[in-house]
Structure formats: structure tokens, C-alpha cells
Amino acid sequence: MLRVVEGIFIFVVVSESVFGVLGNGFIGLVNCIDCAKNKLSTIGFILTGLAISRIFLIWIIITDGFIQIFSPNIYASGNLIEYISYFWVIGNQSSMWFATSLSIFYFLKIANFSNYIFLWLKSRTNMVLPFMIVFLLISSLLNFAYIAKILNDYKTKNDTVWDLNMYKSEYFIKQILLNLGVIFFFTLSLITCIFLIISLWRHNRQMQSNVTGLRDSNTEAHVKAMKVLISFIILFILYFIGMAIEISCFTVRENKLLLMFGMTTTAIYPWGHSFILILGNSKLKQASLRVLQQLKCCEKRKNLRVT
């Protein structure tokens, strides 16, 4: 029987999942409508892919977590954990791939450095960005092929994907190998976000020194962008902390509370960043406000009919 604390964690995780599906579903729907109107831009394509991959990732996180909590013995057969591992790699890497592409897009569009290479890349953003997206996709596919080889070799050797009695050191080494592509995308996103924050911070200081005592709209926009980026980095780090906790819990199966905490921490990123994107993107924000206004109007009409 679940304890009160465990019940609270499950409620939080389910709530995060619902918010994540709604938030990312809204982002995907808005951009799909633009696609139907032949207005889908590069950023729209990235946001749509990011939303779809995160919805898929949320379901994998919940499915894997609930299996480990309620029926951990199912994984002993080997086949299910093999499928979950493949789905996890696909969802995780595709989500990271689109998130990295989004970071690079904002970096090339917004950042301002005097470096010759950066200026060359910035002047050719429309050419460089598709190339970078394809490069990231190819690296993701190569990494997935490598992961498939690792899982297949281990299955052939042990007649199961994961031997639940394997040494912890061997298990963690294999997890690092499985997540090499994710670590690469995470590092690249982190670097681009940090450089973008530095660029915005420098530009903000210059504007404040030129216009003493005043904060124009551009300054406010730059401060807002820095807050969004810092929030993104914090959520990104929390996501990896949650992943590390969940991976470690696989070798300590009795500690359900720690596993639930890891699930809760991991699920913060997919739903939290979706709402940050909605609030930070003018098109998505306006669309969300229109939806809220429509809901308020429907509620008022319903109340009038009742009275």
C-alpha cells in the first residue's frame, strides 16, 4: 500500500505529465495550423518537432517509472526493457536534438560577437542552420545505431538486455555509453546558451551606460531573454539530475521514494520548458491568450444559460 508521501509524488508526476502534454500539444497545434497556412518557418519546424518528441518522452518517463514502481519484476524477462530502452533513446535523443537546434537558432539570431567566424555564421544563418540540423540528426542516428549494437551484443551475451544482478559499475558504464549522444547535445546546448547569455548581458550593460536612468523596450526584452535562458539551463540540469537518480534506482529497487523523486525531477523539464516557450514566444503567447479568452467566453455563456 502506498504511503502518503509516495501518493503525493505520484500525484505530482501525473500532474506534470498532464501539463506537459497540454503545453507541448498546444505548441505543436499552433505550428501545425501555421503549416496548413503555408506559414511554417524554421523556428516553427523546430518547435513542432520539439513538442512532439517531448510528448513522446513524457509517456516513456511515466511508463518506465510506473513499471519500476508497481511491477519491477516485469523487467526480469528482458524483452520489455529492450523495447523501453529503444523508445527511451529515440524520445530522449530526438527531444535533445530539437532543443539543441533551438538553442543554436537563438544563438545565431540574437547573439552579437565580433569574432570573424561567428559573424560569418550569423550572416549565413539560413544556410548554416539547416546544415547544423542535418548534422545533429546524422550524429543522433549514428549514436542510435551504436546503442542498438550495445543492446544487441549484451542480449546475445546474457540472453537478456539487462542482467539485474550485474555489477553496478558495469551497469553505470553501459548507461554512460547509452547516453553519449544526449550528453553531447546537452553540452552543446549549454555552451550556446551560456554564450548567448554573455552576449545579452554585455549588450544590456552597453544600453544602460548609453541611456542612463532609462530602461527602453529593447533592454527589457534582453533582460527577459536572459531570464528565459537561465530558466532553461536550470530545467536542463534538473532533467539530468532526475535521469541520474532514476538510473541509480535501477540497481536499488527497494527505494521507491527515491525513484519517485527522480521521476518528479525529470518530468519538470518537458512541461516547464514548454510553458517558458509559450510565455517567451510572442506568437504562442498571443495564441494562448486567445484560447483563454475563448474559454472565459464559453464559461460566461454557460453560466448565463444556467441562470
Swiss-Prot record:
CDD domains noted in UniProt: 7tm_TAS2R10
Extracellular-side segments: 1-6, 64-100, 148-179, 249-257
Membrane topology: Multi-pass membrane protein
Record-level Gene Ontology MF annotations: bitter taste receptor activity; G protein-coupled receptor activity; taste receptor activity
Localisation: Membrane
Ranges of the Cytoplasmic topological domain: 28-42, 122-126, 201-227, 279-307
Glycosylation sites (chain numbering): N92, N158
Ranges that cross the membrane: 7-27, 43-63, 101-121, 127-147, 180-200, 228-248, 258-278
One GO CC term, this protein: membrane
Note: Several bitter taste receptors are expressed in a single taste receptor cell.
Family: Belongs to the G-protein coupled receptor T2R family.
Protein known as: Taste receptor type 2 member 10
Species of provenance: Homo sapiens (Human)
